[in-house]
């Protein structure tokens, strides 16, 4: 049987953050391909201490994986929505059991936060432990592109088991193509507009005009050539966008993609590109 890991949580606080859109679309595609969801229900572990939360998540994953049999395949979207320090042990057990596991990578946390001086050492250590060991126990990996593949190979992952996705799907229910778009219209910026990810928004050049969509924008610092339209659910966002070209940019400078998130664009395929093309 072919499965995909479906993580379910009691509290979903990110409804208007497109961070879940890519994962949801992957699940939709896998469903259409005949994959079966292997559900993992995790309680609100934010109310637990660190040790209790780790034990709870490990037990939830272990319970789900016990349903898999020799010859089964499972696709896991990586990283897990909420990490488990013992995840690699579970993958090792699946391998011994004869279950084939595949990662579809959304982010490499060690790559994204390697230069983040504000991140506590214990969190960086956790990322290194959970990410590095897990990558070696799977049968195949879907990476973003050849640059990310190169990073994985440098980490010791066999190149022949890595496939490049190139770009994420952005599924739109009840799609209606817009016909009134003109290149002289404002530039679109959509996504997470918070200070730590998109500080460049407060130092953009005076031309052209920009239309902004997303969470975290500080309207009190809005520039004269910026129009903020608020935030929308991911499936509603494409029809709400007004403008010409979409801007794929992150970081604290409008001159170059700098900072933690700006540098990360060198390696990943931004989901914004999928949104704009859709």
Question: Language-model segments: which ranges?
Answer:
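Carbohydrate-associated surface elements
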Residues: 147, 165-168
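Alpha-helix capping/helix-boundary segments
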Residues: 109, 147-149, 194
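A short, active-site helix/loop in glycosyltransferases that binds the activated sugar's phosphate group
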Residues: 113, 133-161
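Nucleotide-sugar-dependent
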Residues: 239-278
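N-terminal pre-catalytic "stem/leader" segment of glycosyltransferase-like enzymes
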Residues: 1-89, 95-102, 111, 115-116
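Membrane-proximal helix-turn-helix segments that form the acceptor-binding/catalytic region
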Residues: 90-100, 120-141
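Conserved catalytic-core segment of nucleotide-activated headgroup transferases in glycan assembly
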Residues: 168-242
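Acceptor-binding helix/loop patch of EC 2.4 sugar-transfer enzymes
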Residues: 102-126, 257-260
């Amino acid at each position: 049987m072919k499965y995909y890991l479906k993580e379910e949580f009691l509290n979903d606080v990110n409804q208007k953050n497109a961070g879940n859109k890519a994962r949801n679309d992957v699940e939709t595609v896998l469903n259409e391909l005949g994959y079966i969801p292997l559900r993992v229900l995790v309680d609100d572990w934010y109310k637990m201490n660190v040790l209790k939360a780790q034990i709870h998540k490990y037990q939830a994953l272990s319970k789900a994986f016990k349903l898999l049999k020799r010859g089964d395949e499972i696709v896991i979207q990586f990283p897990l929505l909420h990490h488990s320090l013992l995840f690699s042990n579970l993958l090792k057990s699946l391998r011994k059991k004869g279950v084939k596991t595949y990662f579809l990578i959304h982010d490499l946390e060690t790559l994204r936060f390697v230069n983040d001086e504000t991140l506590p050492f214990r969190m960086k250590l956790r990322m290194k432990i959970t990410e590095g060991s897990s990558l070696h126990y799977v049968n195949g990996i879907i990476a973003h592109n050849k640059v990310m593949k190169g990073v994985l190979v440098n980490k010791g992952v066999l190149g022949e088991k890595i496939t490049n996705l190139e770009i994420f799907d952005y599924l739109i229910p009840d799609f209606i193509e817009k016909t009134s778009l003109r290149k002289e219209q404002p530039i679109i910026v959509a996504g997470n507009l918070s200070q730590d990810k998109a500080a460049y928004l407060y130092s953009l050049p005076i031309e052209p005009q920009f239309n902004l969509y997303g969470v975290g924008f500080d309207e009190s610092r809005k520039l004269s050539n910026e129009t903020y339209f608020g935030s929308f659910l991911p499936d509603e966002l494409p029809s709400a966008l007004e403008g010409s070209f979409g801007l794929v940019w992150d970081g604290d400078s409008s001159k170059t993609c700098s900072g933690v998130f700006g540098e990360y664009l060198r390696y990943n395929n931004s989901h914004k590109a999928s949104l704009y093309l859709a």
